[in-house]
From Swiss-Prot:
Topology of the protein relative to the lipid bilayer: Multi-pass membrane protein
CC per GO annotation: membrane
Keyword terms, alphabetized: Glycosyltransferase, Membrane, Transferase, Transmembrane, Transmembrane helix
Record's protein name: Alpha-(1->6)-mannopyranosyltransferase Rv1459c
Highest taxon, organism lineage: Bacteria
Role: Catalyzes the addition of alpha-(1->6)-mannose residue.
Region feature Disordered, mapped onto this chain: 569-591
Similarity comment text for this entry: Belongs to the MptA/B family.
Length: 591
């Protein structure tokens, strides 16, 4: 047993521990502090939205604020606008941090209060200009290329639309000649938006933000259900995952298609695991793979006094249970669709496949059979989608498009850049490109090995599939050739539904705050260094003053517990925690 505790699978599984599913209700003092915290965060997002009028990624043409006296003012005082945006983002992040006091403690806020808080914080950003990124303009250009009958996987905005096109003008120069790196589902949706809005940039941007809102809604729906499946408190998972500042800043304000990818993936995983739980799928055989679990149990265990022949005769006329199969099929379809937005979410299909193989016996034969079935289903869905959209499988050839970016957040890329600079200093020449290809290849190899090992751990019942998926995505993000701030959400959101140890949550919080606050500016490529420095210094002073002014009114410190405990609180001190319903014996190391 002591040796077992030193295994890697045990170390990963130890990140999870069942926690109290429902906390005691908040006291009057805590409810007041919660309301003030909610207002503090909402004020921050309002400041972000106002500052975005000058510091956001506004379009080059068709800017609706141009010439409007009040709305055009922020664009004339860009340093002030950047200060407002930065200050608002810090206020929202600090409010989120204080909100954690009401989601991780013994007394917790209700799910409804957390949902309303998230909605309140997002509302100002839904009508604000894009922030932190201009990717949405690439979405518009690539979708317009498809609407014009060209292949967005072969031509970029400049060659497909022309340099003077209204969409191309707003696309960053780095991406004007590159084909689309996104899946056919996303480009198909974008083509529909282009058909609906034409060349109206504002309407098209708002439609893409609506798509993001749909994705966020799916995330909010799926995350607490996955958390409940893993024995984790719903509000804890939602706070760390769906209410994460990175989601608000980059997916909502920045309009990134990761929202749709994650929403479809998480919803698909929940549906698939629910179907497998409902069926308790037995090992497949010609006699049993079309029977419902009740019929199979009856055929294997005839009633007392009944002859084996009688039990067999009852199994001849089974009543199939199509519900579990439909849920598994729906989940698999949603996961595959998510991969047709961005490919990394296809990892979820691997973990659903291993759970299915575990249900079928957990041996090599079961794994090969489950892999063949799920791979065939996945390829069929991709083929149908490629045929329906007219885009085929061209996306395979553009998967490496983003590798032209040299991201300092990617350890393989950072290592190569550092090595290249050392070589230059030593007079050995600039070998950065060669080293970059080597370090990135090693990173991809490590990702492949780790994902295969995690799949094997789930197959053997040593790791919960949600935990395996989250860790696999974390490894993928860590060693990916290109890492953007919002990529951290690939791992944080699924892990928030499974990992409960303080070490993980502290690491996730620190990563969120460091990347969210000290990462990008609202539109860094438009600002001079002195503007960024001035705005950062001014924001720091303003935030310090705000903390000083609200120190006694906001929960900057832990609130003193009230002496009187309500009857409702006493009754809810030891609620029954729902254990994972999917073969709990399979994940004994995760509890």
């Amino acid at each position: 047993m002591a040796a077992r505790h030193h295994t890697l699978s045990w170390s990963i599984a130890s990140l999870h521990g069942d926690e109290q599913a429902v906390g005691a209700p908040l006291t009057t003092t805590e409810l007041t502090a919660l309301a003030r915290t909610r207002l503090f965060g909402a004020t921050g997002t309002v400041l972000m939205a106002i500052g975005a009028l000058g510091a956001g990624a506004r379009p080059v043409v068709q800017d609706p604020t141009f010439g409007v006296r009040l709305l055009n003012l922020p664009s004339r005082i860009q340093t002030v606008s950047l200060t407002m945006t930065t200050t608002g983002a810090v206020m929202m992040a600090l409010a989120w941090l204080m909100l954690g006091r009401f989601t991780l403690g013994r007394r917790r806020m209700s799910r409804g209060k957390l949902d309303r808080t998230l909605l309140l914080w997002m509302l100002p950003l839904l009508i604000a200009p894009p922030m932190y990124s201009k990717d949405v303009y690439s979405y518009l250009a690539q979708s317009e290329i498809g609407r014009d009958g060209l292949d967005p996987y072969r031509v970029g905005p400049a060659s497909g639309l022309g340099l003077g096109h209204v969409f191309t003008l707003s696309v960053p120069s780095l991406w004007r000649e590159t084909p689309a790196p996104y899946g056919p589902l996303f480009l198909w949706i974008g083509r529909g938006i282009s058909s609906l809005t034409g060349e109206n940039i504002v309407a098209a941007v708002l439609c893409h933000r609506l798509v993001v809102l749909i994705g966020v809604t799916l995330i909010v729906w799926a995350t607490p259900r996955l958390a409940q499946r893993c024995g984790v408190a719903e509000v804890s998972a939602l706070w760390l995952g769906a209410a994460n500042p990175l989601l608000i800043m980059h997916l909502v304000a920045g309009i990134h298609n990761e929202a749709l990818m994650l929403g479809l993936m998480l919803t698909g995983v929940e549906f698939a695991l629910r179907g497998l739980d409902m069926a308790n799928t037995p090992r497949p055989s010609p006699e049993t793979w079309r029977l419902g679990p009740a019929t199979i149990r009856a055929s294997r265990r005839p009633e007392l006094g009944a002859s084996p022949r009688a039990g067999a005769s009852r199994a001849v006329k089974p009543r199939p249970e199509w519900g579990p199969l439909a849920m598994l099929l729906a989940g698999s379809i949603l996961i595959t669709l998510s991969s047709q937005v961005k490919l990394p979410s296809l990892l979820a299909m691997g973990f659903v496949t291993t759970v299915l193989a575990y249900r079928w016996g957990g041996n090599l034969r079961a794994l090969l059979l489950a892999a063949a079935v799920m791979a065939s289903l996945t390829l069929a869905i991709m083929a149908i989608l490629g045929w329906a959209s007219g885009l085929g499988f061209g996306w395979i050839n553009t998967l490496g498009t983003a590798n032209v970016v040299r991201s300092w957040m990617s350890p393989p890329t950072l290592l190569a850049l550092g090595t290249g600079h050392v070589g230059i200093l030593l007079g050995l020449g600039d070998h950065t490109t060669a080293v970059l290809s080597l370090t990135r290849a090693i990173g991809v190899l490590i990702i492949t090995v780790m994902v295969c090992w995690l799949l094997l751990a789930v197959l053997r019942g040593r790791l919960h599939p949600i935990g395996g998926l989250g860790v696999a995505l974390a490894v993928t993000v860590l060693l990916f050739p290109v890492v953007q701030p919002w990529y951290l959400l690939w791992a944080i959101i699924p892990l928030a539904a499974w990992a409960t140890r303080p070490g993980f949550r502290v690491a996730a919080i620190l990563a969120t705050l460091i990347v969210g606050i000290f990462g990008p500016t609202a539109n860094g490529d438009r600002f001079a260094l002195f503007q960024i420095v001035d705005a950062t210094a001014a924001s720091a002073i303003i935030v310090i003053l705000l903390i000083a002014l609200t120190y006694t009114r906001l929960p900057w410190r832990p609130l003193a517990a009230e002496q009187v405990v309500t009857a409702a609180e006493s009754a809810s001190k030891t609620p029954a925690t729902r254990r994972p319903t999917a073969a709990p014996d399979a994940y004994a190391d995760s509890t």
